[in-house]
Amino acid sequence: MKPSIVAKLEALHERHEEVQALLGDAGTIADQERFRALSREYAQLSDVSRCFTDWQQVQDDIETAQMMLDDPEMREMAQDELREAKEKGEQLEQQLQVLLLPKDPDDERNAFLEVRAGTGGDEAALFAGDLFRMYSRYAEARRWRVEIMSASEGEHGGYKEIIAKISGDGVYGRLKFESGGHRVQRVPATESQGRIHTSACTVAVMPELPEAELPDINPADLRIDTFRSSGAGGQHVNTTDSAIRITHLPTGIVVECQDERSQHKNKAKALSVLGARIHAAETAKRQQAEASTRRNLLGSGDRSDRNRTYNFPQGRVTDHRINLTLYRLDEAMEGKLDMLIEPIVQEHQADQLAALSEQE
């Protein structure tokens, strides 16, 4: 490993120990905001520190084994130990390289998840409902919180569009590769001939930004319409114009929010989603310019990005970006998504490593 990388790892390891000491300090414990910030930093440094400690131990083992090679009686055992230590050292070096990759500052943030029915009419709306349920199950398994911001239901079930905020540790970093086109192939319940229909939905995942980082939006650029909230009736039927539709005139981005009974709350929610959408559009534009020579696994949330196909008759799910096919569709639809997310995260890391080695 390069001396410059070892020096960087030593500095991070020292910082990890320093933060650990600070977390035990009474002054830090009394300041909740500082305690939370240091706890986050400690968690981020822990893997690097632990891996580096293991790597240092392996270097000591290699040195000891090399010294033992001079002893004829110990040579055979020393050769075995040396081979094992070198293999382990290589594995740890690879892990450390991944841990040192530049982190996306948005990865630890909450996220807005949008699922929209595309081509396919009622069947697309039903599939949008299935996708939202799939992500909700995944969130539940990871102890994330799902809050529906806005929903437009399909005529025969599912959703024409649904927007939810998902809160928890590392939500955006885990879900960001879901942005793009999702295609379903299955026989609709109304299909008497047993023909397979193809429908599509688009998914967009955007980080929730702190207020200070939201893009500046000129109020003159907004058209705000109020309307009566639709949805289930009953005793809580909404009789006031509390639902909000905000149109950002320069970009044409439209956000609706009708989940709350208060117009003020709906407006606040809609503005936060609008800010996230504008930020996401600006980021996508920048990434496109930067990655024009290299493939970009991070979808734009556009229907032209074909991420996955879910083929129900074959029980198959295919990720077209990395040519991954699994015959475990039922598990995926129940929210067991790590088997699909992990390979694309690893592929993204491999691309980042390749980009770094090109720079070097």
Curated annotation (Swiss-Prot):
<dbReference type="Pfam" id="PF00472">
    <property type="entry name" value="RF-1"/>
</dbReference>
<dbReference type="GO" id="GO:0016149">
    <property type="term" value="F:translation release factor activity, codon specific"/>
</dbReference>
<comment type="similarity">
    <text>Belongs to the prokaryotic/mitochondrial release factor family.</text>
</comment>
<dbReference type="InterPro" id="IPR050057">
    <property type="entry name" value="Prokaryotic/Mito_RF"/>
</dbReference>
<keyword id="KW-0963">Cytoplasm</keyword>
<dbReference type="InterPro" id="IPR000352">
    <property type="entry name" value="Pep_chain_release_fac_I"/>
</dbReference>
<feature type="modified residue" description="N5-methylglutamine">
    <location>
        <position position="235"/>
    </location>
</feature>
<dbReference type="Pfam" id="PF03462">
    <property type="entry name" value="PCRF"/>
</dbReference>
<feature type="region of interest" description="Disordered">
    <location>
        <begin position="284"/>
        <end position="313"/>
    </location>
</feature>
<dbReference type="InterPro" id="IPR004373">
    <property type="entry name" value="RF-1"/>
</dbReference>
<keyword id="KW-0648">Protein biosynthesis</keyword>
<dbReference type="InterPro" id="IPR045853">
    <property type="entry name" value="Pep_chain_release_fac_I_sf"/>
</dbReference>
<protein>
    <recommendedName>
        <fullName>Peptide chain release factor 1</fullName>
    </recommendedName>
</protein>
<dbReference type="InterPro" id="IPR005139">
    <property type="entry name" value="PCRF"/>
</dbReference>
<comment type="function">
    <text>Peptide chain release factor 1 directs the termination of translation in response to the peptide chain termination codons UAG and UAA.</text>
</comment>
<dbReference type="GO" id="GO:0005737">
    <property type="term" value="C:cytoplasm"/>
</dbReference>
<keyword id="KW-0488">Methylation</keyword>
